């Protein structure tokens, strides 16, 4: 199974709106996200020139950048995205599935660990300021 390398960063934010610059494989992507409401948020995503994405990542985004490999796995009719982080977030692996609505039933694969939905420290935008390698043992256990 092959994954896609992601390198992403976040522009400084006022907290209500987040702006992410990402390189996914060989594509540049600009994403604008609203604040979270429940388990959902408004999200707008646009492909941008790869060279522009590289410049924005290295000159405009907060550091450290988020580096990970994403794998996609099908389970019970849904596509799970599995992110294996490296760099400042080495050791962290997260799984996510996109739902059609908040009430949609999900059959969890037996390889899923602890539920972290809504736990802010797991947001990629938060991992920039407080990377996984700096977490305490208690935080890594999910307490």
Language-model features: where?
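Phosphate-end processing signature that detects enzymes handling 5′-triphosphorylated RNA
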Residues: 1-143
């Amino acid at each position: 199974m092959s994954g896609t390398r992601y390198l992403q960063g976040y522009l400084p934010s006022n907290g209500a709106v987040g702006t992410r610059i990402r390189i996914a494989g060989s594509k540049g992507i600009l994403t604008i996200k609203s604040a979270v409401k429940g388990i959902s948020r408004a999200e707008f995503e646009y492909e941008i020139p790869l060279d522009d994405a590289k410049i924005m990542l290295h000159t405009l985004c907060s550091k450290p950048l988020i580096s990970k490999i994403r794998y996609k796995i099908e389970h019970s009719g849904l596509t799970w995205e599995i992110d294996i982080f490296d760099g400042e977030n080495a050791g962290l692996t997260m799984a996510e599935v996109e739902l059609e609505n908040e009430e949609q039933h999900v059959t969890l694969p037996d390889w899923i660990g602890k539920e972290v939905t809504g736990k802010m420290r797991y947001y990629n935008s938060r991992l920039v300021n407080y990377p996984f390698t700096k977490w305490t043992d208690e935080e890594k256990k999910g307490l």
